[in-house]
Amino acid sequence: MTTLKIGTPKEVFDGEARVAMTPDSALQLQKLGYDCAIESGAGVLAGFSDKAYSEAGVEIKKTAAALWKDVDVVAKVREPDDGEMKRLTADHTLISFFNPAGNDKGLQAAAKKGASVIAMEMVPRISRAQKMDALSSMANIAGYRAVIEAGNNFGRFFTGQVTAAGKVPPAKVLIVGAGVAGLAAIGTSTSLGAITYAFDVRPEVAEQVESMGAEFVYLDFKEEQKDGAETGGYAAVSSPEFREAQLAKFRELAPEMDIVITTALIPNREAPKLWLKDMVKAMKPGSVIVDLAAPAGGNVEGTVQDEKVVSDNGVTIVGYTDFASRMAAQASSLYSTNIRHMMTDLTPEKDGVVVHNMEDDVIRGATVTFNKEVTFPPPPPKVQAIAAKSQEKPKELTPEEIRAQEADAFKAQTKQQVILLATGALLTLGLGLIAPVSFMQHFIVFVLSVF
């Protein structure tokens, strides 16, 4: 049987520095029985040279056309553009971010060609799939980088200091949204010494937030929120009343905060506007807002995608959409590991043959086209309930059995007391033989006072 080949082309999206295959991940893919290929220069921006790939046994292809023609599985980062879609054939399995909810044209084109497409953002958020969860991997990096970016634009220390030149107060940081990106931002902010606050509509994350050293911002409002497990770890749409209470709390916090990082997203919807113009105006000059929801329209009024702007009152609003790409080496390492784990599930025999098992919850959930059909959206994951162990009803005792048990218990208790008294008497007698008379008098008084 011919060995299948996995290939990674150079990303064509302007400014994208990540790569879907690293030399380390290529070595692991080869252990699964695959040959590996990469377009020349694909890993340069992430710090991986062609020489490093060659030393890892990866074939270097001079052009993207040559690579697409020669490989069976294509691993990418960004969704393919029109030129790449033209190169896609029925013999290809494409593994990439694909934006299936907003890319109907791409879905139809891939299905018509007969290609199998696995969208990495569609990996179900279940325990077994965590190793393949590319969204979480990239969100983790984005949350960390958001704090670093905020610090780069903030004119002071994060931590408070007392120096010979005077006292420096700690920065106050508010994280809106405590998902993967939010928790990463909280961890980074607290480790830098800032006083960190966090808000999320899901009350179950409060314990996580507080365990990381941040203060959870509670609302004085009663509303049943969906559990995070029901919404894939994302927030659900809130009621108008809850939103008003939420905005009122943000208006209260705005004048105190030095840095605000927003991360709130709702699947397949525009990001909710949570930090409005009046809140920006209420912030101190020199404050910084980082809007991680900028790719979905932004949580902040005034965010400009891929730009950094300064408001009239001196508040910097960062709307970059490439935080993960700004840490290309780390992001490529994590993403390529997600790809490798996906390939491991697709290769159960480790023989270099793709087995596209649509009965597998993870593979089915991530597959958006298969056998010339659009398979998006996927059915909800099957949650197997664990049957509770049947508890045997305790046997009812007869009056005779109860009396017998009570008698046995009385005998055991009496025996224990006799042994303790006898032991105490022997110890006292032994002590009296060797101790002075005056000591024994004091000892007897002490024992009597205890009892």
Regions found by a protein language model. Give the residues of each.
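A structured beta-alpha segment of the ubiquitous adenosine-cofactor-binding alpha/beta core
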Residues: 57-69, 79-80, 227-260, 264-277, ...
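Adenosine-phosphate binding glycine-rich loop
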Residues: 121-163, 170, 294, 300-387, ...
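Structural signature of hydrophobic alpha-helical transmembrane segments
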Residues: 437-448
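Glycine/serine-rich phosphate-binding loop and adjoining beta1-alpha1 elements at the start
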Residues: 2-5, 11, 82-172
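An N-terminal-biased, well-structured beta-alpha scaffold segment characteristic
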Residues: 2-109, 113
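Glycine-rich phosphate/diphosphate-binding loop of Rossmann-like nucleotide-binding domains
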Residues: 9-47, 159-253, 406-413, 435
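Rossmann-fold NAD(P)-binding glycine/threonine-rich loop
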Residues: 101-127, 269-322
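Cytosolic-side membrane-insertion boundary helix
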Residues: 392-422
